[in-house]
Amino acid sequence: MLNLFDNFDQASFDFLRSQRTAQIKIPTVVINDDGFLPPEVESPIKYWGNYNVNKKPLYFDHLSLPRYWRILSTAAQGHIYDLDKKRADIIYQATDNTRQVKEVRWLNNNGKVSWIDHYNRYGYRFAQTYYRNEQPAWRKYYDKKNRVFLEWNLIAGDFFLDVDGGYHFPSLIELVKYYLQTRHFKLDHIFYNTLNQGLSVSLNLPADGSDTLFWHEPLSGDELPGNMKFLMENSTRTKHIIFQRYTDWQRIGANLKNNHVDFGFLGTIYPHPRANQLRPQALILTNSDEIVELSTLIKNLPNIKFHIAAVTEMSGKLLAYQQYENVELYPNVSSARVKQLIADCDIYLDINRQNEILDAVRGAFEQNMLIVGFDETLHEPQFVTPQNMFKVNEAQKMSKHIMAALLKPALMKELIDTQRQLASEVSVQDYQRMIGALQSE
């Protein structure tokens, strides 16, 4: 049995963490390694790169640069300058001010990307991508001794593996098949979670397996994806399709009947270290001063303390809110302070425009905070129930809703329970029962 993911995105993280929480241990392989996979997750690049796992990520000011070149950096990204000419952009693994280098995008004299140096969680420059006509054309992967072990023609799609005399593979799928066979994984039952590369690998393995698609993407209406219909219309290794979104499953699950695959539902196990304590403390995490109807909410809710934090400096517009007694501002907030704020607040206001920072909404959800927002500002709508979504012109209604929840414990419990249900939350027992049934086939 094997987890096979195209990428280690949020859905893959949730699925793997749910398995671990339920004490289910299945080997996990990620096809596209971005360099920052968890130590327990495998990939072809990690296997042939053989990196020293005791090393740390590269900190931005440890980049090797020509003399007199300099780095200008914020919490979110960096730039390399030769006097006043920008030579490269630095992409960090996260925007939490840790400044761990993931990519350095080197620019030509026209300011376009010439090549990219890719760094991994162990501080190695493990890959380089070269551009031609402003498009990625060729990628080289390096092992721990800085030797090229794999080259990828990004235009033609084929690979050259310099291992054991050398191999040529016409596609990524053939390379992955070779890797899986080389690693001697048990391929009798594969769990995959996309209808792209994971499915392609499954379709190209011996037909005597029994695979399961865990489908986490939202459906567009009641229309199923074309590749899912293919699995329903043909006999393949895929015998099960498990929906992971509660709302989609509730809407169409009863109508899914098929001779080639069976259907089921299994959502996500989320950690909840605490319950909502109905404290009148509201949190906003933002790097933007575009916070919708903030003044109205502050004035309507004088008994609620508004904590507004940013990992950057704050604009004069935002700093002006210091005039209100029920507002506390935290510019250049530290990670420790963010953790404390998340623990101390019971309301999260998802009302800022621009990008979300620090996975704020997910963090609020896992802390059982009541998440409230405007329909135009929601960053993670799957964690916000319809009762907690408002039109931009409904700030008064939002204010009354927040106060009612704080004053009525039964209402708060109902809102939090619905918030968790609509986020597709399930129990450890649900996971053990479903995965156990699949393992016993």
Curated annotation (Swiss-Prot):
Localization, UniProt: Cell membrane
InterPro entries, per database record: GtfB
Family designation: Belongs to the GtfB family.
Pathway(s) the chain acts in: Protein modification; protein glycosylation
Biological process terms in GO annotation: protein O-linked glycosylation via serine; regulation of protein stability
Location, primary (coarse class): membrane
Keyword Membrane: yes
Keywords, comma-separated and alphabetical: Cell membrane, Membrane
Recorded GO CC terms: plasma membrane; protein N-acetylglucosaminyltransferase complex
The protein's assembly and partners: Forms a heterotetramer with 2 subunits each of GtfA and GtfB. Part of the accessory SecA2/SecY2 protein translocation apparatus.
Membrane topology note: Peripheral membrane protein
Protein name, UniProt field: UDP-N-acetylglucosamine--peptide N-acetylglucosaminyltransferase stabilizing protein GtfB
Organism, scientific name: Limosilactobacillus reuteri subsp. suis (strain ATCC 53608 / LMG 31752 / 1063)
Gene of this entry: gtfB
General function of this protein: Required for polymorphic O-glycosylation of the serine-rich repeat protein (SRRP) in this bacteria. A stabilizing protein that is part of the accessory SecA2/SecY2 system specifically required to export serine-rich repeat cell wall proteins encoded in the same operon. The GtfA-GtfB complex adds GlcNAc from UDP-GlcNAc to the substrate protein, attaching the first sugar residue. Stabilizes the glycosylation activity of GtfA. Has no N-acetylglucosaminyl transferase activity on its own.
Source superkingdom: Bacteria
